[in-house]
Swiss-Prot record:
It comes from Cupriavidus pinatubonensis (strain JMP 134 / LMG 1197). This is tRNA 2-selenouridine synthase. The gene is selU. GO terms for molecular function: transferase activity, transferring alkyl or aryl (other than methyl) groups; tRNA 2-selenouridine synthase activity. Monomer. Signal peptide: none annotated. It catalyses: 5-methylaminomethyl-2-thiouridine(34) in tRNA + selenophosphate + (2E)-geranyl diphosphate + H2O + H(+) = 5-methylaminomethyl-2-selenouridine(34) in tRNA + (2E)-thiogeraniol + phosphate + diphosphate; 5-methylaminomethyl-2-thiouridine(34) in tRNA + (2E)-geranyl diphosphate = 5-methylaminomethyl-S-(2E)-geranyl-thiouridine(34) in tRNA + diphosphate; 5-methylaminomethyl-S-(2E)-geranyl-thiouridine(34) in tRNA + selenophosphate + H(+) = 5-methylaminomethyl-2-(Se-phospho)selenouridine(34) in tRNA + (2E)-thiogeraniol; 5-methylaminomethyl-2-(Se-phospho)selenouridine(34) in tRNA + H2O = 5-methylaminomethyl-2-selenouridine(34) in tRNA + phosphate. It is an enzyme of class 2 (transferase).
Length: 366
């Protein structure tokens, strides 16, 4: 029989399967990557038990819980837990604090299915606290290298090629600009933070001399980078990625147009997917219209509509280059040039994709 565990580091480093027995609403507010929600009580049952606990105390609340979850419903839930336990003999279960709900699930599994299955002591709350501490410790003690560069230089491509890199935009499911929204929704803030902390933990444990991250604002779409981590990034050495204007236009076309269209069409089908993709581009352009000014916004919107029409009616994507070129030259490049000037003292290396990738691999290696 395996013992209950409080070794959170081992759980997250090994990707141990975990069964979350909290109510679905609790799970939706924040969970860990790969965990499976198989609740002891659903949201309404938990609500009723909570009211009973507040009014009549723990004993009455436990009795009500047993009356609500009984018979065929109880048997179904036990069967689901047993299936998980058999499929993941190395796993664990947990509730919010690792207390009564976890213990009841353990007892029912033991009594009704003959399965001894360990729990995580301290539950979700303790594991969440551990991951918050991981970020704080990394910000205090870990060296970072920050990858910067103009829009379209391929920073995300470099991040994917450096083993010590943490893909902040991948974890946030957002490319980090007005045009950065993906077809898939962003994770909940807490889920983003949990995934980020686990990623940082795994790379720090691997012994890399420095972790590599892309230069980001405090927010990636609607997700907020932990303040201590972002502040550490602002004080860390920078590497500046360079690429020709033509290369950048092609990369923006690939990622922000063709890739975005493919994501939406795969998700919604050719007609609804294309319309959702077109709406996403229009909305992004509108979002930066106050900074573009009315004349430039009108010109870019017209170019965008012409490109969307060509793409929809004839499958042509080349016309998108027209608005991409104007947007890069007149909007993003001046903005990044200003940012580059402010950060010039922090830049320790410059180069193209191959040179920067090699430099980052060497300087971050174990």
């Amino acid at each position: 029989m395996r013992e209950d565990t409080g070794d959170f580091r081992r759980l997250f480093l090994s990707g141990t399967p975990m069964m979350d027995v909290r109510a679905p609403l609790e799970f939706a507010r924040g969970a860990f990557p790969g965990t499976v929600n198989l609740p002891l009580m659903d949201d309404e049952e938990r609500h009723q038990v909570g009211l009973c606990y507040a009014e009549k105390g723990q004993h009455a609340a436990i009795e009500l819980g047993h009356r609500l979850v009984w018979g065929a419903l109880k048997a179904t839930r036990i069967a689901q837990w047993a299936d998980f336990a058999r499929a993941h003999p190395d796993g664990y279960l947990y509730c919010f604090r690792g207390g009564l709900r976890s213990q009841i699930v353990q007892q029912w599994l033991r009594d009704e299915a003959g399965i001894d299955y360990p729990r995580v002591t301290g539950g979700y709350k303790a594991m969440r606290g551990f991951l918050i501490d991981v970020i704080e410790q990394a910000a205090a003690k870990q060296d970072f290298l920050v990858l910067g560069g103009l829009t379209g230089t391929g920073k995300t491509d470099v991040i994917a090629e450096v083993p010590a890199a943490v893909d902040l935009e991948g974890l946030a499911c957002h490319r980090g600009s007005a045009f950065g929204r993906r077809a898939q929704p962003q994770p909940q803030q807490i889920d983003f933070e949990n995934s980020l902390a686990i990623d940082v933990l795994q790379r720090a444990e691997a012994g890399y001399r420095a972790l590599v991250v892309e230069d980001e604002g405090r927010f990636i779409g609607g997700r907020d980078l932990p303040k201590v981590l972002w502040q550490r990034m602002q004080a860390s050495p920078m590497v500046w990625l360079e690429a020709s204007f033509e290369e950048r236009v092609e990369r923006v076309l690939r990622d922000y147009v063709l890739g975005l269209a493919a994501e939406h069409i795969e998700q919604l089908g050719p007609v609804a997917g294309f319309e959702a993709y077109a709406t996403r581009l229009r909305d992004a352009m509108a979002a930066i219209s106050p900074r573009l000014g009315s004349e430039r916004y009108g010109r870019l919107s017209a170019l965008l509509e012409q490109a969307l029409t060509s793409q929809s009616e004839r499958g042509e994507t080349a016309p998108h280059r027209a608005w991409i070129e104007v947007l890069l030259r007149d909007y993003y490049d001046p903005m990044y040039a200003y940012q580059e000037e402010k950060r010039a003292a922090r830049v320790v290396f410059r180069g193209d994709r191959a040179a920067v990738t090699d430099w980052l691999r060497e300087r971050s290696a174990r």
